[in-house]
Amino acid sequence: MEIVTKIEDLFLPTKHHKFCKDDSFERITWEDVIDNIDRNVCEGAFPPLKLRDNLGIVSHDTRDILKTYPIRQLIMDTRPNIHPTCHLYASLTSISETFGKHDDFMDVIIWQCIGITRWTIYDEKVYQYDLKPGEFLYIPMGMFHDTTPVTPRASISFGLENRPPVAI
């Protein structure tokens, strides 16, 4: 696993996964998570809030979580053609359902906010790592991975879909 010391280096294209710890961003709290869920339910967000088995939650509408904005801005400053998507994943128990082994159609950066999530990454070797609060993990497009909540947890994913500039 490649370890970088500056969070900006996570946003640079690479074919390997990378890891970084950075406590300079204001942490997401359970209050932020509950407020986001409440707003999604009350406003009927689209795409809708997903409640998964065993108290797992996926929120595709995170505009109200202002603590994500400095990271979104850093992504856009570092990769100008990227307008990041942002999703909240919360597991209220350590047995919450996840997506299983899968790959994504875009690069993804995970920000572990609360609790611990075990990541299994299938590269040339299989890596397992327990991501803790304040840590970031970069997963390149097409790299298979799986997650398991070790404790109740909340994390934010930033999808780095490359969108070429549009000519007007």
Regions found by a protein language model. Name each.
Residues 9, 31-135, 143-168:
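Active-site region of the double-stranded beta-helix
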Residues 1-34:
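An N-terminal JmjN-like helical accessory module and its immediate linker preceding a catalytic domain
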Residues 138:
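Conserved beta-strand-loop-short alpha-helix elements that form
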